[in-house]
Curated annotation (Swiss-Prot):
Gene3D superfamilies: 3.30.465.10, UDP-N-acetylenolpyruvoylglucosamine reductase, C-terminal domain, Uridine Diphospho-n-acetylenolpyruvylglucosamine Reductase, domain 2. It is found in: Cytoplasm. InterPro entries: FAD-bd_PCMH, FAD-bd_PCMH-like_sf, FAD-bd_PCMH_sub1, FAD-bd_PCMH_sub2, MurB, MurB_C, MurB_C_sf, Oxid_FAD_bind_N. This is UDP-N-acetylenolpyruvoylglucosamine reductase. Belongs to the MurB family. The lineage of its organism: Bacteria, Pseudomonadati, Pseudomonadota, Gammaproteobacteria, Legionellales. Coiled coil: none annotated. The active site is at residues 176, 225, 296. Its EC number is 1.3.1.98. GO terms for cellular component: cytosol.
Length: 308
């Protein structure tokens, strides 16, 4: 079938929801971005596999969870977006202190689920504003914890809808980076934690969230950390040392609370404002420190606004 002529009749056997020309701003934590040509909300993993198997092999695909760590440009995305958040949301307690979690589960939910089941080592997920699929994709972490330190195995799916089970040794895992995925996406993982105490873990989560609220602009639209920390230093320290706190382009502002955050002030920024500010910060830091800040955030889509 031709994706350009795709309509709901093409997915009559699917159980999910297919939307057309769907604005993406509401699906991202920055609250910016143009529309997706198509957006699919799968009912479950089997439904996702069926949907993918019927797409043209060259169809552009974008996977979104909570939409953190992503900047969708104002022109939107001309392919199909797969939305996992609120869809692939199963968590199952297994034996041997293990949990099976699907990609659409929020990291915060995973932290609470593990704590309430007397497992420790996953409290740090409460501080990650994304889904477990995204956490697996970039080895997300904070407060001394990283996602892949707990991975026993993962399930991936390719654009033909074929599902594989893979082991950690098949990937190259580093700081905020996972290589070896190829043209596949994470759909679930088996994670092993340590025996713990529910009350202790829940208190750790409470303390972590309080610290996050105190040190990060959690009451403003943001994507999380914009840049990776360079070896032996912190991106926020470098940005602040260059006098960039509070610098703005349009409604995009370098946070006064944490310099490695760019906020969409009162929802007035465009994606173009944010992207321009990212480049400005990189340029100023490079000029003043000779250090190249590497983006943690992914920039996606068409910069030009389309007339539809």
């Amino acid at each position: 079938m031709s994706i350009t002529g795709m309509d709901s009749s093409h997915v009559t056997e699917s159980q999910g929801t297919l939307l057309f020309n769907e604005p993406l701003a509401e699906y991202t934590t920055w609250r910016v971005g143009g529309p997706a040509a198509r957006l699919y909300k799968p009912a479950n993993i089997d439904d996702l596999a069926l949907f993918l198997s019927r797409l043209p092999f060259d169809e552009p695909l974008l996977w979104l969870g909570l939409g953190s760590n992503s900047l969708i440009r104002d022109g939107g995305f001309s392919g199909t977006v797969i939305l996992t958040q609120g869809c692939l949301k199963e968590m199952t307690l297994l034996s041997d202190n293990c949990i099976r979690v699907e990609a659409g589960v929020s990291c915060a939910s995973m932290a609470r689920f593990s704590a309430r089941n007397n497992l420790s080592g996953g409290e740090f997920w409460a501080g990650i504003p994304g889904t477990m699929g995204g956490a697996l994709r970039m080895n997300a972490g904070c407060h001394g914890g990283e996602t892949w330190q707990s991975v026993i195995e993962v399930q991936t799916i390719n654009r033909r809808g074929e599902i594989r089970t893979r082991k950690p040794e098949e990937f190259e895992v580093a700081y905020r980076h996972v290589a070896g995925l190829g043209d596949e996406w994470f759909i679930s993982a088996k994670l092993q934690l340590s025996p713990g105490n529910k009350e202790t873990s829940l208190q750790l989560i409470k303390d972590l969230l309080a610290h996050r609220a105190k040190t990060q602009p959690t009451n403003e639209y943001n994507c999380g950390s914009v840049f990776r920390n360079p070896p032996g230093d912190f991106a926020a320290r470098l940005i602040e040392s260059c006098g960039l706190k509070g610098v703005s382009i349009g409604g995009a502002v370098v946070s006064e609370k944490h310099a490695n955050f760019i906020i969409n002030h009162q929802g007035t920024a465009t994606a173009a404002n944010i992207e321009a500010l990212i480049h400005l910060v990189q340029t100023k830091v490079r000029e003043q420190t000779s250090i190249e800040l590497i983006r943690e955030v992914h920039i996606i889509g068409d910069a030009n606004v389309q007339t539809r």
